[in-house]
């Protein structure tokens, strides 16, 4: 019907122009009036045909097709009752027929209820109506399946039951669009959001309720989702992520409070790096929520008040529109904060002491916003190169100690070869002042390319005299610095020189005409298996270093938070209220060594016939 409509308008306009030129102004006016009232002949014929077609089809559906019955009935209910009583029969009357004989169906069942339910497929009887959308179904199981599609709509309020008209989830479409689509097509996308037909609401983009259905807070319940004020139609789904920022902050406060409670109850050993890492794992990346860092001043976060998205009465203010978050129960008093700060300090020291295990063999790259806040000494950071030539910037993590400085013995000597024997003073020592048994802590790469040997201050290496040259070792570095085991022989790079680079090619043939041999080109390319092994090991070390770094960041953030609250005195005073002068004589203050003052008129010892028992501490 819609395609021929544009073609009919030019034909009618041409006929009216011809009539107007022949008859005059009056006839043209009458022609225009007739145009607005009289429809096109083709349109009338099509509408008449469409109106008669459903009537004939409905009459055909009300004829009994059971074998050669061909009896006609006025309603589907009468046809259904006729088939059940006349053709199916009953067992009590000894005429039960369990085989469907509608046309050529021949469906056989085992019970009468089964075949009577099957007959609904042939009869246009739909007695089962959906309460949500009003759609009718033939069988109850079909309605049951259909109702499951409205599972997400079970909390919605029907428009007829909503007294305020503006608090339901599914507002009625505007009156101006009733001629396009009286029932807008609703569907759910893959995210579970309710959508509507875009074509039906295309011209209503300026209307607040034309492009989407937004959830509104109900004033009948205490818990609901708040929606921020929205003044324009949006194409993306809204969802329930309006208060995501506040939820993240509340979740962060809960996790920090749980961590403080576990630390106070000594459920976390401050000297165990493994337990500290497991307890800090939930806080990784959560102390910097999208709305800003965790600060001590924000003890409550008010939520925005609900705003109407579409036309209708403004909902009344719900008392739960603003939610106030109380301070942390585990860090309320000054004593709690001091205790937590002490435990955090012990945990921080433990993390520092385990830096050699977490950062072994990891190169600290230069970063623009590097992590330079955790240095042991106030001395300025240094800048040196790792054995691979990578520059270690001053913004990277560099706890400064004597071991992090490049030893003059590892510098290039006058002969152009690096010193072979590593000095004992530049090695990493544990708390027992013995050389670390791990080979990674003794390798030159770990000593200068990472922070494996920065735990304890070591004796600085004195520069040799100029006459000795830089190729000789200092007196303080002579002597064995290893244990007597055979591990020294197979340490793998401890006393071995690094492989020299490829020799320079001869310069007589620079034209490039000759092709290098395969063996020469293969020297510079490692095998894929070795590269994959190295990459996996490197990735594991980097992940371990990232976890260690994140633990240090979390501990520093928590300590800054606790110290900030102590400096601003943001804690609950635990001062006890003064005792009343007319308290009971049996009240005993266990904290005070002195008894409450005796009131005037009380009998002293000896003035009564019975002795007065002294209370403890009196």
UniProtKB/Swiss-Prot annotation:
UniProt keyword annotation of Translocase present: no
Pfam families given in the database record: zf-C2H2
S-S pairs: none
Single GO MF descriptor: zinc ion binding
UniProt family annotation: Belongs to the pacC/RIM101 family.
Record motif YPX[LI] motif 1, residues: 456-459
A GO cellular component entry from the record: cytoplasm
Name under which the protein is recorded: pH-response transcription factor pacC/RIM101
Start-end of Basic and acidic residues biased regions: 144-155, 571-590
Gene: pacC
Biased composition (Polar residues): 447-465, 511-522
Compartments in which it is found: Cytoplasm; Nucleus
Motif placement: YPX[LI] motif 2: 610-613
Main location: cytoplasm
Biased composition, class Low complexity, residue ranges: 13-58, 422-446
Organism of provenance: Fusarium fujikuroi (Bakanae and foot rot disease fungus)
InterPro entries given in the database record: pacC/RIM101, Znf_C2H2_sf, Znf_C2H2_type
Keyword terms of this UniProt record: Activator, Cytoplasm, DNA-binding, Metal-binding, Nucleus, Repeat, Repressor, Transcription, Transcription regulation, Zinc, Zinc-finger
GO biological process: positive regulation of transcription by RNA polymerase II
Zinc fingers (C2H2-type) by residue: 62-87, 98-122, 128-150
Job description of the protein: Transcription factor that mediates regulation of both acid- and alkaline-expressed genes in response to ambient pH. At alkaline ambient pH, activates transcription of alkaline-expressed genes (including pacC itself) and represses transcription of acid-expressed genes.
Stretches the record annotates as Disordered: 1-59, 144-180, 375-396, 413-540, 571-618
Post-translational modification: Activated by C-terminal proteolytic cleavage by signaling protease (probably palB/RIM13) at neutral to alkaline ambient pH.
